[in-house]
């Protein structure tokens, strides 16, 4: 059936209103103009291979809502050729429904058929009330989609694209899922974006970089995504992070969340502020929690995992949290001697630490008592001897590390990949070494460092004057 376009001209009080009904196949290069807008989609549209549909800035494409609640009946725009929809800041291109009721998704979305050579250029658009949002049927390694000043609202999924995605000044509002899973390929990069009242903001991307973004009133924000999150705010969400691993969270602000960070391991959380959360941080194995201010939450830090001594909790202020400043939910012993609890009274500090003294199924926690400035240690509270060397050498079944002058010697049983970090998570070395002894000439400031191997094992040592 050939594509049928009907043009309606309605006159009222001397003013003419245009709308164009469209459906079916696009078999030749076609432009939808602002003069013909809005375009009322009465049947699904397919742009065929080798053909281009260009939509001018300021156009509205309005899909007729389906009320059967059967997605098989939903109308869609399928791209087997090329779609060019590049709006402007003043004249965005709008893909919407004839019924924009909140929470009602009633058209299918924009489907990019990469398997047939389909491509899209989309920018400065509004997308709302779609079920699948914008999706592609095959991964697009190397493909880049740039979205600037876009708005994604009331979609079941806003975007399901296995490609490299860049968002700038975009808003994700009241979606089921904002940026959906990238199971095979893809990355997400967002700068100065807002995520509000979504059920889930970002899920299972292969790599994310978020800078200067705000997350408010979402049920879930970031699920299972490694990457870097810097200078972002998470306010009044249920879960800010969950099933998180391999992330660097730097200079962020967490306020009023049920859980700030629910972290599974191998992450760095630094220079951030946590306040008014029910639980600020759930910390897994092989992670760094450094230089954070964690105050006035229900619980400050819950330490979990199977090897809590592999997590480095250093130089934080853990103060005035209602239930506990620190809760050990494992049966392992560890120490937090470089953290300040904002009190010089050991009884007050003990009341804020939940460990084996409170529940014999839990391990014990050693700590230090600081003065009111949190700058000077007054004394140590050692509940259990951990037999952890404070400096070099440090020995386990596969490692031996020692320092000679300004050289670090590493002895390993098997070939491995190593990384060298400082306590803030900054990487100074990433190197493959052979079995046996390796000599590393390093220019490092005096201090505490961590050496990790490819299996996630981390080993703390002191580097400096002998």
Residue ranges and their predicted role:
Residues 1-4, 358, 464-466:
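Short, Lys/Arg-enriched, disordered terminal segments
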Residues 2-7, 153-154, 160-163, 168, ...:
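Terminal non-domain segments
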Residues 19-285, 290-385:
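Beta-strand/loop edge motif enriched in small/polar residues
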Residues 39-41, 387, 395-400:
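Acidic/polar, low-complexity intrinsically disordered N-terminal segments immediately downstream
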Residues 393-466:
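C-terminal outer-membrane/trafficking sorting elements
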């Amino acid at each position: 059936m050939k594509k049928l376009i009907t043009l309606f001209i309605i006159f009222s009080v001397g003013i003419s209103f245009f709308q164009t009904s469209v459906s079916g196949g696009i078999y030749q290069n076609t432009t939808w103009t602002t003069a013909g807008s809005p375009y009322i989609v009465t049947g699904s549209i397919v742009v065929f291979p080798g053909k281009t549909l260009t939509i001018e800035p300021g156009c509205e494409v309005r899909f007729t809502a389906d009320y059967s609640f059967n997605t098989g009946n939903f109308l869609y725009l399928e791209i087997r050729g090329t779609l060019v929809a590049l709006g402007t800041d003043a004249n965005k291109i709008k893909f919407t429904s004839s019924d924009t009721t909140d929470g009602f998704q009633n058209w299918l979305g924009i489907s990019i058929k990469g398997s047939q050579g389909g491509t899209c250029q989309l920018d400065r658009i509004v997308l709302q009330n779609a079920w699948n949002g914008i999706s592609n049927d095959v991964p697009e390694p190397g493909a880049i989609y740039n979205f600037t000043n876009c708005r994604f609202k009331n979609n079941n999924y806003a975007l399901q694209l296995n490609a490299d995605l860049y968002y700038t000044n975009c808003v994700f509002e009241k979606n089921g899922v904002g940026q959906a899973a990238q199971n095979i390929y893809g990355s997400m990069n967002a700068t100065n974006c807002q995520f509000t009242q979504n059920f889930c903001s970002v899920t299972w991307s292969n790599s994310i970089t978020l800078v200067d973004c705000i997350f408010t009133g979402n049920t879930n924000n970031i699920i299972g995504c490694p990457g870097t999150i810097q200078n972002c705010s998470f306010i009044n969400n249920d879960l800010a992070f969950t099933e998180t691993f391999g992330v660097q969270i730097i200079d962020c602000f967490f306020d009023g969340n049920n859980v700030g960070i629910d972290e599974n391991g191998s992450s760095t959380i630094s220079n951030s502020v946590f306040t008014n959360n029910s639980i600020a941080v759930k910390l897994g194995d092989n992670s760094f929690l450094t230089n954070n201010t964690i105050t006035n939450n229900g619980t400050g830090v819950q330490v979990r995992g199977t090897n809590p001594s592999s997590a480095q909790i250093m130089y934080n202020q853990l103060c005035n949290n209602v239930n506990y400043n620190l809760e050990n939910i494992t049966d392992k012993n560890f120490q937090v001697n470089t953290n300040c609890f904002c009190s010089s009274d050991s009884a007050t500090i003990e009341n804020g630490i939940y460990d084996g003294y409170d529940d014999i199924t839990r391990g014990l926690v050693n700590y230090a008592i600081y003065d009111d400035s949190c700058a000077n240690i007054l004394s140590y509270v050692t509940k259990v001897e951990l037999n952890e060397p404070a400096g070099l050498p440090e020995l386990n079944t596969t490692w031996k590390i020692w320092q000679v002058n300004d050289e670090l010697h590493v002895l390993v049983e098997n070939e491995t990949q190593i990384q060298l970090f400082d306590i803030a998570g900054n990487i100074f070395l990433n190197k493959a070494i052979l079995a046996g002894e390796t000599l590393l000439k390093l220019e490092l400031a005096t201090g505490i460092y961590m050496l990790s191997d490819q299996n996630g094992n981390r080993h703390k040592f002191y580097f400096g004057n002998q």
